[in-house]
Amino acid sequence: MKDLLISLFLLVAITFAAPAFSLNPPGDFAKSGISVGLVVENLNKSLDFYQNVVGMVKTSEFSVESARAKELGLSNGDRFDVTILKLENSDQAAEWKLMSFGKKPAHPRQKFVPDDTGMQYITLYVKSMKPILERIKKYNVKTLGITPTKLDENRDFVLIQDPDGNFIELIGPK
């Protein structure tokens, strides 16, 4: 009888605790991750950077035809392709969606974060800086400021820019 009561208690506790550990976000959102669309000048150059330097993986791609792009308000009738990258191939991982319209940017390249408005940088938390720094060196990517530098006892900080000038903060242990 005692074992039955303990089992029943555990079953009830797990049933009521399960929603607290759910992967579904509360409120109005269907996913807890954010998908970010980034327009780049040269898709192949950006894919090379994000896959080989940053270490993202390509998970899928799709096209948006001219009429559909206009209908959705995404462009004034320009067709485009989107390549989805993630830090890991997981449904829960945030999506980094790259697309190109084959045009040069209409604004100068930023040298520092406050040089423009809008999204200016992303922060990626890494398990170890060593493989990231090796890839940065291998692909001749310039680190900005006096980086890598220590943030605190346990974490280093590196700042780089992608081929279009978007800033990427990398934070993690040495």
Predicted regions and their residues:
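Positively charged n-region of N-terminal signal peptides that target proteins for export
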Residues: M1-L5
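Extracellular structured ligand-interaction cores
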Residues: G33-S35, V53, F80-V82, M119-Y121, ...
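Core segments of cupin and vicinal oxygen chelate
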Residues: V39-A93, L151
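A generic structural micro-feature
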Residues: D28-A30, L74-R79, V113-D116
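Active-site beta-strand termini and strand-to-loop segments that position acidic
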Residues: L85-S90, I160-P163, P173
